[in-house]
């Protein structure tokens, strides 16, 4: 990402915007993860890193990692102690092939705060308001046919990939806007939301 950014193509001709002129942008570097094989510790390290960012009032854009990093980030920048959301819960606009709300699983590869759990525990722990959040692009093969139930139980709205194809872009945008309203929004995007012909290197399909 940094190598591509360094090419200096900073304007978007189609949208007619230049983000580097609209905003003050800084690269804060990588989150140090000395316990890289310990998922639970890594999540807390991410939270510690983002606590400093949130305290300063800076709005972060985060790239990299698997989707479990969202848990660490939102523990810092949303919820009752957050300056960025004025103490409110965040509302998710979540693009993904999976809901990542599988709280019926005791763990995923030994981790509880995992890429399969973050959309659940963030609701349970008071950082995300599922009643105003929406998950878009859900698709793929499943282990069980009730795999969306856990997300619905939490209060999320879901637009599956089939529904997205049926509704079209404009209607989906309207649904998202109606759902989230004027609540503080956190947008998160998993590459496996894209078709495999576009992102063939994504491991979790």
PLM features: what roles do these ranges have?
Residues 2-205:
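Conserved alpha-helical scaffold segments that buttress catalytic/binding sites
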